[in-house]
């Protein structure tokens, strides 16, 4: 396994729409293992392949503290949404930035697992939010782009200031 580099917003590659995985093979399974290692090392709960500059429809997540429920979604599609909720989100591609995003309260998602087997998952709460957040990445959308123009401007200014201080 290897740690992967996580792209940082506003890197344009984060806006690339991911292509479907054609075949779940050893290359995809290695990508999944590397994504889990990267996500855990970065203390995240979800990671989309787009964030590591691989533009295929692969997502990993684990909402547990003890890493006991790793989930893999290959070619995920949300087939149903219901309700509305807000949640303060963060993102490994936008470190240190958190803001409230409105999303569906419940979702039903269809995907393939790491063996290439199709499954359906009905999710609510944090899992539903995480699914929607990560699937946004596959569509080239970063969570801050779900915020008002004013908030987006403030975040970009904050990130530019931070970047100047690290150079």
From Swiss-Prot:
CDD domains for this protein: Pep_deformylase
EC number(s) stated in the UniProt entry for this protein: 3.5.1.88
Residue numbers annotated as active site: 134
Reaction catalysed by this enzyme: N-terminal N-formyl-L-methionyl-[peptide] + H2O = N-terminal L-methionyl-[peptide] + formate
Keywords of the record: Hydrolase, Iron, Metal-binding, Protein biosynthesis
GO biological process: co-translational protein modification; translation
Keyword match Nucleus: no
SUPFAM superfamilies per the UniProt record, alphabetical: Peptide deformylase
Top class in the EC scheme: hydrolase
Binding site for Fe cation: 91, 133, 137
Highest taxon of source: Bacteria
Cofactor(s) needed for function: Fe(2+)
InterPro entries for this protein: Peptide_deformylase, Peptide_deformylase_sf
Gene3D superfamilies: Peptide deformylase
Any Pfam family: Pep_deformylase
Single GO molecular function: metal ion binding
Coiled-coil zones: none
Cofactor details (free text): Binds 1 Fe(2+) ion.
Family per similarity comment: Belongs to the polypeptide deformylase family.
Reported function: Removes the formyl group from the N-terminal Met of newly synthesized proteins. Requires at least a dipeptide for an efficient rate of reaction. N-terminal L-methionine is a prerequisite for activity but the enzyme has broad specificity at other positions.
Protein name (record): Peptide deformylase
């Amino acid at each position: 396994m290897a740690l992967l580099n996580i792209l940082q917003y506003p890197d344009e590659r984060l806006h690339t729409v991911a292509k479907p995985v054609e075949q779940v093979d050893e290359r995809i399974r290695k990508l999944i293992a590397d994504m889990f290692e990267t996500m855990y090392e970065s203390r995240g709960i979800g990671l989309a392949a787009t964030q590591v500059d691989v533009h295929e429809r692969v997502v990993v997540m684990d909402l547990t503290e003890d890493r006991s429920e790793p989930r893999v979604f290959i070619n995920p599609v949300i087939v149903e949404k219901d309700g509305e909720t807000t949640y303060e989100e963060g993102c490994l591609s936008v470190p240190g930035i958190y803001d409230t995003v409105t999303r569906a309260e419940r979702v039903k998602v269809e995907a393939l697992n790491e063996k290439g087997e199709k499954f359906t998952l009905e999710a609510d709460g944090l899992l539903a939010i995480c699914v929607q957040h990560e699937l946004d990445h596959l569509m080239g959308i970063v969570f801050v782009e779900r915020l008002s123009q004013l908030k987006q401007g403030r975040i970009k200014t904050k990130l530019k200031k931070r970047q100047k201080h690290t150079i």
